[in-house]
């Protein structure tokens, strides 16, 4: 494959954009090559500026559950543009999408739209602090909740990719209010709560950790968090920016039967456009301005383009058998890749929840950040480059999740499995 145009654009970009990209993981540093510059996408395929076409398992980092450029969503957004892109004023579309989200997600009685997942988690934490009158928050090592200062402490995702668990520029005063427990370890949570009795405002957790690969919750973990939070008057926040509407229509809380006090959501509720949301119990949400004293605002929050895309996306997700079909596709490709590795005698640990999956380059089970960090990232980087050469586009980091869309046909999945067999043999 020829990547010369992408290489030229990356050189040019570095003169005007820090690092040449607008989000660090896009730089491909951890996989030892220059990034691709994408020209267009449709269904499960993306095409770069050199004309190379790839089967896409990144899906804009999760939200493209329908595949790229779904005609029903694209048509609705094009029509919405003709009426205006942004008004900075209420629209009926906001109410429609809010009601759809409330009907879908068990924990959400009221919801506030924002423009990103980072905004959603940042605002949810501010609201939890306002509700409880407490300052400290508890998160988990390897879980990423956006790039706000309070949450860039032992984070996963991009921070894990670059080996920087804490970012320069985050004041110690912020960091000292953030407690960090081990994912899937209730004991570590109990210890921190006991040491900070009556001071913890909220526990924020990815119910399916998707920013250190794909790490499911162990049996009893989410239930244990729910019990602890109820006992201690702590707000339980599920960060479902990745898992919401992805692993089930009602998210991971539907799958595992555990209802948090608040939930954050991301771009999937806007069909991949810039959007996020946070919602929860009415008694908490009514503390938000203008009905309450906890301030949160955004000029583009609830903008008509994102709301339109979200409404059409959620309509399509309600189709009979949608998630059953998606589950079959996801199970098929994840199992096929695992078999390919086994056939080649290459040790991997395969994990999957719904249409989120990860091939960990480790012979041992992965259940938290400590075990994830033991993965052979150099071997993954080689695998990534080999798969790219075979026309398969994976996330450029061992610590990211792969996403299957409803647009992936059996022939796409078979081609992916065949590419994996060839790549594992070459390692």
Curated annotation (Swiss-Prot):
Pathway: Porphyrin-containing compound metabolism; protoporphyrin-IX biosynthesis; 5-aminolevulinate from L-glutamyl-tRNA(Glu): step 2/2. One of its GO terms (cellular component) is cytoplasm. One of its GO terms (molecular function) is glutamate-1-semialdehyde 2,1-aminomutase activity. Its EC number is 5.4.3.8. Keywords: Cytoplasm, Isomerase, Porphyrin biosynthesis, Pyridoxal phosphate. InterPro entries: 4pyrrol_synth_GluAld_NH2Trfase (IPR004639), Aminotrans_3 (IPR005814), Aminotrans_3_PPA_site (IPR049704), PyrdxlP-dep_Trfase (IPR015424), PyrdxlP-dep_Trfase_major (IPR015421), PyrdxlP-dep_Trfase_small (IPR015422). CDD domains: OAT_like. Belongs to the class-III pyridoxal-phosphate-dependent aminotransferase family. HemL subfamily. The modification N6-(pyridoxal phosphate)lysine is found at residue 267. It catalyses: (S)-4-amino-5-oxopentanoate = 5-aminolevulinate. Its cofactor is pyridoxal 5'-phosphate. This is Glutamate-1-semialdehyde 2,1-aminomutase. It holds the Pfam family Aminotran_3. Homodimer. Its main location: cytoplasm. One of its GO terms (biological process) is protoporphyrinogen IX biosynthetic process. It is found in: Cytoplasm.
């Amino acid at each position: 494959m020829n990547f010369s145009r992408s290489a030229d654009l990356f050189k040019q970009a570095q003169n005007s954009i820090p690092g040449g990209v607008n989000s660090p993981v896009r730089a491909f540093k951890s996989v030892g090559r220059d990034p691709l510059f994408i020209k267009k996408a449709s269904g499960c395929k993306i095409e770069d500026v050199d004309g190379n076409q790839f089967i896409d398992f990144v899906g804009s980092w999760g939200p493209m559950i329908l595949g790229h450029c779904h005609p029903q969503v694209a048509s609705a957004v094009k029509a919405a543009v003709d009426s205006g892109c942004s008004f900075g004023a209420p629209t009926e579309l906001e109410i429609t999408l809010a009601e759809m989200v409330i009907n879908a997600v068990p924990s959400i009685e009221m919801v506030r739209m924002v423009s990103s997942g980072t905004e959603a988690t940042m605002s949810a934490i501010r609201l939890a602090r306002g509700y409880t009158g407490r300052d400290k928050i508890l998160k988990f090592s390897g879980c990423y909740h956006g790039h706000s200062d309070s949450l860039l402490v032992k984070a996963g995702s991009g921070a894990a990719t670059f080996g920087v668990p804490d970012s320069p520029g985050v004041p110690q005063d912020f960091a000292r209010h953030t407690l960090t427990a081990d994912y899937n370890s209730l004991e570590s949570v109990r210890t921190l709560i006991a040491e900070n009795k009556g001071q913890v405002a909220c526990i924020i957790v990815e119910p399916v950790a998707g920013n250190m690969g794909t790490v499911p919750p162990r049996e009893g973990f989410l239930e244990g968090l729910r019990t602890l939070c109820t006992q201690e008057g702590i707000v339980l926040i599920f960060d479902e920016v990745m898992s919401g509407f992805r692993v089930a229509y009602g998210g991971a809380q539907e799958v595992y039967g555990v209802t948090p006090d608040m939930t954050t959501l991301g771009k999937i509720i806007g069909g991949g456009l810039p959007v996020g949301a946070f919602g929860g119990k009415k008694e908490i949400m009514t503390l938000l301005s203008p009905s309450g004293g906890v301030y949160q605002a955004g000029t583009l929050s609830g903008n008509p383009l994102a709301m339109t895309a979200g409404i059409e996306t959620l309509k399509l997700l309600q189709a009979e058998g949608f998630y059953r079909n998606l589950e079959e596709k996801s199970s098929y490709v994840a199992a096929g890749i695992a078999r390919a590795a086994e056939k080649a005698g290459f040790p991997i640990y395969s994990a999957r929840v719904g249409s989120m999956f990860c091939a960990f380059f480790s012979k041992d089970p992965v259940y938290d950040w400590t075990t994830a960090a033991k993965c052979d990232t150099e071997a993954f980087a080689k695998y990534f480059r080999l798969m790219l050469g075979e026309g398969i586009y994976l996330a450029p980091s061992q610590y990211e999740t792969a996403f299957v869309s409803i647009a992936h046909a059996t022939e796409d999945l078979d081609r992916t499995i065949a590419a994996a067999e060839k790549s594992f043999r070459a390692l």
